[in-house]
Amino acid sequence: KKPAWSHSSLKDFEGCQRRYHEVKVLKKYPFQETEATRYGNQVHKAIEDYIRDKTPIPPEYTQFLPVVDAMLSKSGRVLAEYEMALTVDLQPTGWKSPDVWVRGIADILIVNDENLTAWVGDWKTGNNKYPDREQLKLMALMVFAHFPHIRKVNAALLFVMFVVIRDMAFFALKRKKADERM
């Protein structure tokens, strides 16, 4: 059985195939959390709790509220840390199903069933100098597969460290174009 992939695992593989093999396949080296990854995980958790459970954002992260609240102002069902998985035939499947081919987690997903539009966002605490829009395309395609009634997906990398709108990498995909790609 081939392991399922994700955008982040693909980026790791593209960065250094040997390192990927040593770390992910052979599991020779355990993951070493850095200050940056620890901070990013703490911010993600605080935002997830704020969205899912209405837990107040800790004081050290309140500067991120304008970006988070801008997303929450969109109409529709709000889903935090929404797990999506597809088979090799691009059909939705369970996260841990034996037939899973690709996985992705939407940090925030807003599905508007009335206007058939969705917003998918990924919180970023790092540098916004080289945004990776390929992640947005993958997430948009996964949303289309999981929500077949949706006609348009707006996707964004949300750089919470930079609260001006120009620091949002944005991508929109309509159902017709998505069907051509799948």
Would you name each region that the model predicts?
Residues 5, 38, 42, 131-134, ...:
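Generic recognition of stable, solvent-exposed alpha-helical segments in well-folded globular domains
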Residues 36, 40, 57-61, 175-178, ...:
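Intrinsic-disorder-associated interaction segments
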Residues 143-181:
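Substrate-binding beta-hairpin/strand module that engages nucleic acids
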Residues 33, 37, 115, 140, ...:
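Conserved catalytic core of nucleotide polymerization and phosphodiester-bond processing enzymes
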Residues 45-135, 146-160:
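Catalytic cores of nuclease domains that cleave nucleic-acid phosphodiester backbones
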Residues 30, 118-122, 166-167:
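Short small-residue beta-strand/loop micro-motif enriched in glycine and branched aliphatics
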Residues 33, 126-129, 172-175:
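Active-site oxyanion-binding pockets that recognize sulfate/phosphate
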Residues 2-56, 81-82:
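Nuclease catalytic cores
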